[in-house]
Amino acid sequence: MIAKYIIKHGLELAYDIKADAFMIFTETGKSYELLKSFLKKDEHSGIIKILDKISHKNVKIIVATPNQVTYKKISSENEENIYPIFIKHREDNRCMIISSGIVHALKMKILKENNKIVAVVGEPKTPGKLDTIMVVNVKEHVKTITLYELFETLDEKQKRTLKEIIKLAMEIGREGREGEYVGTIFVMGDTLNVMSMSKPLILNPFAGHNASIFDENVKGTIKELSSIDGAFIITDEGKVVSAGRFLEIKGDVNIPKGLGARHLAAASISKNTNAIAVTVSQSGGIVRVFKDGKIVFETDPRANILFFD
């Protein structure tokens, strides 16, 4: 069984590199049972077992699961130095699974910003298929905490749509258009209110079309239109309703110095409606996510492929 050896070598790697924690992800709990087989003491063996090494180095064992039944079972065992974590959402790729586990562990103060961990993970949504060992510096994930907190307030369709928008924004921020950076805004959700607080700058290219943000052809069209003024309006379900919308700015909105009208509009629409706004900066491709008038996440897509790819 490959999973058994992945766990074994992951534990040994955690010891060898002096990691602060070993993190494993499990759906059904079977991987956790395999893990426990390495952590049992053998009083009759003269061999120094992995348990002795891990205990000596004070390596924390973190077991993360999106399954409530599995989480309750692991928690009820109350094993020393084993920290169970419940993850609300099932993620779509290995990097996102690990990021989610780290963010939850940070919020629970199991991990610290300067920690280094070894994570063992497998094919998403496929129980028992552990196949990957990763060494991760926790500080690289600290900035994603507020983004994950936002995700936790969304249902599955909203979360899926927002991820797709951020992915597309990252691509636009990296690639630009015809070798030049372009700036744009995406507004997701609370569509009726958003439309009432905006006005068209161009004829709507998506009128009469059932355009979806998950359609590669539609994403290509959005990239072509990304250099025009105004915002793309997208529903919670991912339907692209309009492009080139001028967003009204209402009330007092505070944004960091150096940000321009595009970011002010994004902050305002996210404050005055229940929408989430995502911007791409024309000055450098920086991607920012706005909610309730505040920046909850920002990243440079040229430096970070991020966990959505």
UniProtKB/Swiss-Prot annotation:
Keywords: ATP-binding, Manganese, Nucleotide-binding, Nucleotidyltransferase, Transferase. The keyword Transferase applies. Its EC number is 2.7.7.85. It comes from the Archaea. It catalyses: 2 ATP = 3',3'-c-di-AMP + 2 diphosphate. It is an enzyme of class 2 (transferase). Gene3D superfamilies: DNA integrity scanning protein, DisA, N-terminal domain, Pyruvate kinase, C-terminal domain. Pfam families: DAC (PF02457), PK_C (PF02887). GO terms for molecular function: adenylate cyclase activity; ATP binding; diadenylate cyclase activity; manganese ion binding. Residues 144-301 form the DAC domain. Its cofactor is Mn(2+). Disulfide bonds: none annotated. The keyword Nucleotide-binding applies. HAMAP family: DacZ (MF_00840). Belongs to the adenylate cyclase family. DacZ subfamily. Diadenylate cyclase that catalyzes the condensation of 2 ATP molecules into cyclic di-AMP (c-di-AMP). c-di-AMP is a second messenger for intracellular signal transduction involved in the control of important regulatory processes such as osmoregulation. This is Diadenylate cyclase. It comes from Methanocaldococcus jannaschii (strain ATCC 43067 / DSM 2661 / JAL-1 / JCM 10045 / NBRC 100440).
